[in-house]
Amino acid sequence: MQIILLEKVANLGNLGEVVRVRDGYARNFLIPQKKARRATDAALKEFEARRAELEKVQAEKLAAAQALAERLNGFQLKISQKAGVDGRLFGSVTNADVAEGLRKAGFEAVEKSQVRMPNGQIKAVGEYPVQAVLHADVVADVVVLVEGEMA
């Protein structure tokens, strides 16, 4: 399926590019998320008419993401979980837990889908690096400090 990208999409293209993707990817993800629309003649004409407006919106989103990343870079998030005497957690700390902790710390714009945990879920007490992908071009590094509570 041919689509027009309405914003920058990682590993696919930039705003305004016409690309070919699988039908399911377009119908189930890109179009419902308002990241793309079908590349018909009418849609191409409408896009060219609205191009400046869409570029302005993209620039605003990028600026907001960069401002949030400046505040978020190097931030140390403390999470307490029940743990055994050997330091292993009962359960684990997931990206949803990290996103919730960041929201409570005043970073409301961070969603769980934006949190990347390079080593997977955290299952022991300690310090762990985590990334928050705020925009296709903006990534913030956060340190998660997991403290154990005696069960």
Swiss-Prot record:
Keywords: Ribonucleoprotein, Ribosomal protein, RNA-binding, rRNA-binding
InterPro entries from the UniProt entry: Ribosomal_bL9 (IPR000244), Ribosomal_bL9/RNase_H1_N (IPR009027), Ribosomal_bL9_bac/chp (IPR020594), Ribosomal_bL9_C (IPR020069), Ribosomal_bL9_C_sf (IPR036791), Ribosomal_bL9_N (IPR020070), Ribosomal_bL9_N_sf (IPR036935)
A biological-process GO annotation: translation
The keyword Nucleotide-binding belongs to this UniProt entry's keyword annotation: no
Bilayer-crossing regions: none
UniProt GO molecular function: rRNA binding; structural constituent of ribosome
Any one GO CC term of the record: ribosome
UniProt superkingdom: Bacteria
Alphabetical list of SUPFAM superfamilies matching this protein: L9 N-domain-like (SSF55658), Ribosomal protein L9 C-domain (SSF55653)
Record's keyword annotation contains Ribosomal protein: yes
Recorded family membership: Belongs to the bacterial ribosomal protein bL9 family.
Function: Binds to the 23S rRNA.
Protein's name in the database: Large ribosomal subunit protein bL9
The organism of origin for this protein: Bordetella parapertussis (strain 12822 / ATCC BAA-587 / NCTC 13253)
